[in-house]
Amino acid sequence: LSQLGKEDWCICFNYYVGEILTNIKYRNSQKVFQQVKGGSKVFYKLNDLENQTDCIITEGEIDALSFEVAGFQNVVSVPDGGINPEVKQIQTKLDYLDNCSEYFKNMHRIYLATDSDAPGIRLREELARRLGKSRCWIVRYPNGCKDANDVLVKYGSNKLKECINSAELYPIEGIHYANDRRDELKDLYENGFPNGAKSGYSNLDE
């Protein structure tokens, strides 16, 4: 790794488009990452989206592989991780979306399984905004788990499947569901409408 100024043992994540190797990301045991200089920005495991109508997007390669262990094949990872909430200019960081747009044209459901920290939430928001919130679903993890790999290690494959099965449709501004107003409706059912303002006329105020 040139970042460390020395050779080191690494995991190599190979990025393919079709049969063409377009990029390689290296990761050592200290979680230092490096990509091939000049490599193209695409999703990891992009070929797995061929002929799919649903997909899962993760924040890292290990998370994508964790879902694969749980039995999901239609999983990809972004190449550059989460997005710092303080950074304003992020277009170049999301170039992979433009480079892979054809793969998402026919997607009906897109599960956003990013990390639950601030950079992961920012990434999720940007992905939903660009891919279309009406077809995006938020994947949430159990308490104490930051990402899909945490869930797999701590709870196993079945729990990771539950995370997908219980995913929530991305909230769309201006649209409300009955469940969002459950407490208000229950109060209205049990207590009725509140009394209006007094008019001062007893016949009207009854």
Predicted regions and their residues:
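Phosphate-handling DNA/RNA-contact segment within nucleic-acid enzymes
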Residues: 2-106
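Acidic beta-strand-to-loop metal/phosphate-binding motif
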Residues: 55-57, 103-119, 140
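Short hydrophobic alpha-helical runs that function as membrane-insertion/retention elements
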Residues: 74-77, 111, 136-139
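A residue-level signal for conserved active-site and pocket-lining positions in enzyme catalytic cores
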Residues: 112, 148, 204
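The Walker A/P-loop phosphate-binding site
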Residues: 173-206
